[in-house]
């Protein structure tokens, strides 16, 4: 391994950025695979970073134990990239990009680690996540030839039909065209890591009537000493990975506890343990994609100044495709708003920009026909819906910052249409506030998060 920390920028390396596939892109492709009953295969590149070509002249000392006799004063000139170099991941990504394009694959312009090969009725998708390759397609013969060709270019490990992707278990019922994503094994490890495997099981990931704030930070030296022994940041990080992959149901709760990582108090830690207890009860929940209409639908919502520290609102959104959630978000707004309408208008603007990316990403595939059809974005506030369509100068909207009016341009060019929906049917509601159990679980059903018995 090279001592990359001794490299000098501008001399030994220049750019170091290397993209990886986004989790939402993987979920979208899995939803498409479930709808069309595509094959899902997996491969792994052995020692991937040794395949990159170097543009710079890099020298390194001879490795200990392999020093050439009578040439102890000599150094090695690298012909290829190796682990430890600052540019190693970038060199590998560039090499793979060149190789896969030479075999007829086209790169998705809006997701550089997703490739497509479409010829006649044969459809192939390839996803690259560092050294993990996901191959999705409808022709076993062509897919086999791709695997043979990749093996001729790199040292590959054929993992066959995909069962685990980045720690996510894939469960398929091909007869009913259903695909489930489960992190039960990961959740078990998290519970054991934080000694919660024998705790009581929680009904919800949040506690009603117990808002979090900066006032709950440690106030006495005893509390400070106690919290120093608590693995708060590690627990939040572990929860966040589950939330980002397959568990939109804990998105709001994880977002709330993550705001206090710099100096958490006992009540903040109790909130984290409450989420762990909920995951203990729902460890077998899956994110399910079914053979439903392959039309993306968006939902947006916001609360009003629920943040007790800065009086800012929380925006929430979720997009579904094929009966399951493909992307979701719960974030604190960057501005202070003056009304509920303004809060929901700001939230809708951010979601509309996500819809633009989603439409471009899907249009590039050529199998989801949405080029001429706008994505429907549901909002439960009539004022925000009206404000998004036409300029309205009234006392509740005249203070809205100009940059949020981009949603009108997005609507005008036909990328998005904003429609009114009842709050009870708004799937984005759980991303902005704590809900009663029955309402919360009905929204989970709409997002495809459920317990499946003997179906997958």
Predicted features, each with a name:
Residues 7-12, 49-54, 307-311, 328-331, ...:
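Cytochrome P450 core scaffold surrounding the K-helix E-X-X-R motif
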Residues 24, 30, 82, 130, ...:
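C-terminal reverse transcriptase regions that engage the nucleic-acid substrate
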Residues 32-37, 277-302, 370-371:
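Structured nucleic-acid-interacting core domains from mobile-element enzymes and related host factors
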Residues 3-5, 239, 299-341:
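RNase H-like nuclease fold core
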